[in-house]
Amino acid sequence: MHPFTKTLVTTALPYANGPVHLGHLAGVYLPADLYVRYMRLKGEDIIHIGGSDEHGVPITITAEREGISPKDVVDRYHRMNSEAFSKCGISFDYYGRTTSEVHHKTAQEFFTDIEEKGIFIRKSEKLFFDRKADRFLSDRYVTGTCPICNNTEANGDQCEQCGTHLSPLELINPKSKLSDATPELRETMHWYFPLGRFQDQLESYVHQHEDDWRQNVLNYTHTWLKQGLKDRAITRDLSWGIKVPLESEEAEGKVLYVWFDAVLGYISFTREWAEKLGQSERWKEYWQNPECRLLHFIGKDNVVFHTLMLPAILMAWNEGRQSECYNLADNVPASEFMNFEGRKFSKSRNYAVYLGEFLEKFPADTLRYSIAMNYPENKDTDFSWQDFQNRTNGELADTLGNFIKRSVDFTNARFDGEVPWDYSEDLLNNVLLCDQIDDIARAYDGFHFREAVSSSMDIARNANRFLTQNEPWKLIKTDPDAAARVMSISLNLCHALSILFYPVIPETCNRIHAMLGFDGTIDSLIKPGVSLWEQAKKPGLNKGHRLLGKSEILFTKIEDADIAPELKKIELLVAEAEKREAGAEQQKMEFKPLISFDDFLKVDLRVARVITAEKVKKAAKLLKLQLQVGSATKQVLAGIAKYYTPEEMVGKNVVIVANLADRTIRDDVSEGMILAVEGADGKLFVIEPEGEEINGRQIQ
């Protein structure tokens, strides 16, 4: 393992087009903060960089819908989200904005450098243009009918009904969202980044991390590499964004694509952090220093941007340089998703718990603990109000909080608020089990945050059990020295727990620190080169040390009445969702206009057998099927990849519309359509005829 001396942690930039919700917190920001706080406890040199992604089409759409400027939109949500993160204890060293002057300059420097090296490719292409609005239309400004499922409200980038990723040119009857007019095709030129040029380098880079990156990260990355990396546009025809830094007619009205500019925010924000410290060159110690470890904390939907695209951009910059070369990420700990009460978080349906609103009602530390214990490391997890209540009451209040308060209160009452006994480190280890602390450290080091926090709570349970079983309130009457030994151990366990739990419930641990009679906070003791973590293994409170003299209830229990309004909200949201689903189902049940018997006879339905099946590149929902229809073969592109693997389809009997006119989809020809039925949950089930010697036979 590389002996790194510094660590730079970045977190995915939340889009400044809405408030962050608990799903965002669980997948990205809390795990990053747990790791950063743990590393600070160890005395490591680490910085945590984040910020707002403030460019892109959704922001302009929101601004136009509300009749305000894009700047007004991003100002609102940057402030809202940064305040929510701060209130939740997410300890950024710097939280920037991609609308800043430094960021614009940084992104333009990268563009200029790569352009001057001749790496970019210029391509002319035809895009939709709205004559009424006098502007080119990006994919999200175009709507129309999906060619796969015939949804009449598909967007230009994706059909929400069937999930197929689309381009605006694939839509049937496209219309502009700006004017409702039918757009026309016009030629425009854009700059493209040739990802394929760096495929070999990227494959070598990824191969170096086969043993230490998470499987989901490797799976997403390998899928893209196997398909072959393609050129990717890095400019758009928009007014909101970072201007292409060229004085030419071609660059007029063009900005950098947000995927290119946003990932460079990590660099520009680190620059701003250094400038804020008055050490403008210090950022290079973290970006251009091989001794610094770079970690990107993200959700699984962001993987390839951090394992392929950003590394490729940095490779392009490094090309031909002997100095000022950028580090590539050493690890990309991407999380799975956290759902909410059994359903996916959805801003569009308002099915979410927003972080700022949550913290107006409940303490941050209770949320941090609950989410850490449900951290979606290897699979999707679920946040529920009942689980939140149970963990707060049963684990934080009844276990950790109860032990701390009992220990402090008994010492204040029976030993005049002083630690009553000196003892050896071995005595503490017999109770605390330092091996457990080492196991917790290994869990944090390996990004296994749920394991780390769960093991910390196990120590709290053992401590609580130790106090209860030894009954110092009885011993004090018969053997005061024995009671003194028990309380000295208990108080030192309180001290150890204040350190072990600091990454997850920092505000509470600072309060425990004060109750134990220490000046300042744990935060104030943190400094590079000093390991507070190791101090958790040693007696921190010697005989005669005075406690604060008073205690407090660390966690207020959550009553049923406290979460009743939240459960009611869920009922209403679920009812609305079910109503929409029922309405959609009812709409589907409406029969189509009558046709004549002769028209029906024109449809040639036949039994076919699937010979081969494969996924379609850049179309996550499509399978390409080769079908044997009697003595003939046909190729069909079917939108079933979400529900069937290629291997599952091979050998199946299916029903094909054999005389359907050919249709071009994704530059490939589909010579028919297979029949499937949609279940109540939206899942598609392919119709499979049974019987022998029926291949090629007509359905009657």
Swiss-Prot record:
It catalyses: tRNA(Met) + L-methionine + ATP = L-methionyl-tRNA(Met) + AMP + diphosphate. Keywords: Aminoacyl-tRNA synthetase, ATP-binding, Cytoplasm, Ligase, Metal-binding, Nucleotide-binding, Protein biosynthesis, RNA-binding, tRNA-binding, Zinc. A motif ('HIGH' region) lies at residues 14-24. Is required not only for elongation of protein synthesis but also for the initiation of all mRNA translation through initiator tRNA(fMet) aminoacylation. HAMAP family: Met_tRNA_synth_type1 (MF_00098). Homodimer. This is Methionine--tRNA ligase. It comes from Pelodictyon phaeoclathratiforme (strain DSM 5477 / BU-1).
